[in-house]
């Protein structure tokens, strides 16, 4: 028997025993190269991720300091998933989910599946059961630091439980990974930062739960709080910086900058002005911003107010940015948000911008 026939026989036997799709040639189906995504709800982050959102069938880790915007990012992803008709689940190990804030960010809280487990084992088992059901599109676990092992909860204060949480995460992820891929579910772990003791050189910061999550994650996002945004003398929000420190589906190390406004969420208008000015979709001359030769505001705040009031122009600018920065996902596609038929968007790319920046 030739090698080719022996291989075909083996492939056929594997498919018969384990089911269709258990093994295949990478070029057998075009779909193998197309990754399903759930948009992040933030244009700059979709661009930084390289594929227009979070990849489905993968594990994502979002980590950062307290109050840096980690939970906000996951709630925005849940809102986008629900807008596409998907089902979302939130495993609230921290017991800190605010339904009012989630609703403010666009989450359909009435249809959001929520669990508040007592132990880390229970939380991960619930997540695994949801994934295996195949009926959930996104599962968020908030957070790894709050996944307390049962032995620690039942023990006394001060008892030593070295490496218990790390072993729990390692065991759970080995079990979860195959199920996540099979069901094409997006699973997001929120994680916190701790300081290593005795580190003299290099970064002393590390994440909780051991190293397993770092290895199993296809994408790792580091969230940092930037400067404050002021409305007069009052602080109305702060800048958020998200760095893609690991990416298995696109080039890593891209960064997304955007504004988080207290009581409102992510400022879409600020994103459009920053990205529009960077890629010459919006012209900037001194403090003035213009679109198609028409002045829209003096200074960023006035321009943001203009775009809030003029939604048609805002949607047109958004579409132009998406078509320029994510052409594979948005170019030549009909959309309810796109300008009316017959109108053309002319985009002039800044010649100083390299092709790498457009990815």
Swiss-Prot record:
Q: Which amino acids does the record list as binding ATP?
A: 64-71
**Gene3D superfamilies per UniProt:** P-loop containing nucleotide triphosphate hydrolases
Q: Which UniProt keywords apply?
A: ATP-binding, Cytoplasm, DNA damage, DNA recombination, DNA repair, DNA-binding, Nucleotide-binding, SOS response
Q: Does the keyword Cytoplasm apply?
A: yes
**GO BP terms in the entry:** DNA recombination; DNA repair; SOS response
Localization recorded for this chain is: Cytoplasm
Picking any one GO molecular function of the record gives: single-stranded DNA binding
Which portions of the chain have biased composition (kind: Basic and acidic residues)?
331-344
Question: Main site of residence?
Answer: cytoplasm
Report the SUPFAM superfamilies cross-referenced here: P-loop containing nucleoside triphosphate hydrolases, RecA protein, C-terminal domain
Q: Would you tell me the Gene Ontology cellular component terms? A: cytosol
InterPro entries reported in the protein's UniProt record? AAA+_ATPase, DNA_recomb/repair_RecA, DNA_recomb/repair_RecA_CS, P-loop_NTPase, RecA-like_C, RecA-like_N, RecA_ATP-bd, RecA_C_sf
SMART domains from the xrefs?
AAA
Ranges where the record places region Disordered: 329-359
Family assignment? Belongs to the RecA family.
- Function recorded in the entry: Can catalyze the hydrolysis of ATP in the presence of single-stranded DNA, the ATP-dependent uptake of single-stranded DNA by duplex DNA, and the ATP-dependent hybridization of homologous single-stranded DNAs. It interacts with LexA causing its activation and leading to its autocatalytic cleavage.
PANTHER family documented for this protein: MITOCHONDRIAL DNA REPAIR PROTEIN RECA HOMOLOG-RELATED (PTHR45900:SF1), RECA (PTHR45900)
Q: What is this protein called?
A: Protein RecA
Protein species of origin: Francisella tularensis subsp. holarctica (strain LVS)
Top-level taxonomy: Bacteria, Pseudomonadati, Pseudomonadota, Gammaproteobacteria, Thiotrichales
**Its encoding gene is what?**
recA
């Amino acid at each position: 028997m030739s090698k080719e026939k022996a291989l075909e026989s083996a492939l056929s036997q594997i498919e018969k025993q384990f089911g269709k799709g258990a093994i295949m040639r990478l070029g057998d189906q075009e779909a193998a190269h197309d990754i399903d995504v759930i948009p992040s709800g933030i244009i700059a982050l979709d661009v930084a991720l390289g594929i227009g959102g979070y990849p489905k069938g993968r594990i994502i880790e979002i980590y950062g300091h307290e109050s840096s915007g980690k939970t906000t990012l996951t709630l925005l992803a849940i809102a986008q998933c629900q807008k596409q008709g998907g089902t979302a689940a939130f495993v609230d190990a921290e017991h800190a989910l605010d339904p009012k804030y989630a609703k403010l960010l666009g989450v359909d809280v009435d249809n959001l599946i929520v669990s508040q487990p007592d132990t880390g084992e229970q939380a991960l088992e619930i997540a695994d059961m949801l994934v295996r059901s195949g009926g959930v599109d996104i599962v968020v676990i908030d957070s790894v630091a709050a996944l307390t092992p049962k032995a620690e909860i039942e023990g006394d204060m001060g008892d030593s439980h070295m490496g218990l949480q790390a072993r729990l995460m390692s065991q759970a992820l080995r079990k979860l990974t195959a199920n996540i891929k099979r069901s094409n579910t997006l699973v997001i772990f929120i994680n916190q930062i701790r300081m290593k003791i005795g580190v003299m050189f290099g970064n002393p910061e590390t994440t909780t739960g051991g190293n397993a999550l770092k290895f199993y994650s296809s994408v790792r996002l580091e969230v940092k709080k930037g400067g404050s945004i002021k409305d007069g003398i009052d602080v109305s929000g702060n800048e958020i910086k998200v760095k893609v420190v690991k990416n298995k589906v696109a080039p890593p190390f891209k960064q997304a900058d955007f504004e988080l406004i207290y009581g409102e969420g992510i400022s879409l208008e600020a994103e459009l002005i920053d990205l529009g000015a960077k890629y010459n979709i919006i012209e900037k001359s001194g403090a003035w911003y213009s679109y198609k030769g028409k002045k829209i505001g003096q200074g960023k705040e006035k321009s943001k107010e203009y775009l809030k009031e003029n939604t048609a122009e805002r949607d047109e600018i958004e579409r132009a940015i998406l078509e320029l920065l994510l052409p594979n996902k948005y170019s030549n596609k009909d959309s309810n948000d796109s300008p009316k038929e017959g109108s053309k968007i002319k985009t002039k790319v800044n010649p100083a911008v390299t092709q790498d920046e457009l990815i």
